[in-house]
Design a protein with these regions (language model features):
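Long, charge-rich, low-complexity alpha-helical segments
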Residues: 29-81
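A short, structured beta-strand/loop element
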Residues: 4-45
């Protein structure tokens, strides 16, 4: 499979983080940043925590892609009590 461009800022590469989505030019997992966003962490604080290796535009792209993925998989979701 090699590498794949998912967006302007997000890629997958089997040689980086076992092929998990990361921000281009980093080893920062998109999932880690999305968890920070979900925990209501300010985007500026997220950027600072990652020492400026990601930008607001990169975080925005991750959120938009996650939203599209969720919407496209809604029929597959099972909500439990």
């Amino acid at each position: 499979m090699g590498n794949r461009t998912i967006g302007r800022y997000i890629i997958t590469d089997t040689k980086i983080c076992h092929g998990q989505p990361v921000f281009r030019g980093t080893r920062i997992l998109v999932a880690d940043v999305l968890e920070q966003v979900a925990s209501d962490m300010a985007w500026e604080a997220i950027i600072e925590e990652w020492r400026g290796a990601i930008t607001k535009d990169a975080i925005s792209e991750a959120v938009k892609l996650a939203s599209k993925a969720l919407v496209s998989h809604v029929p597959d979701l099972v909500v439990t009590g």
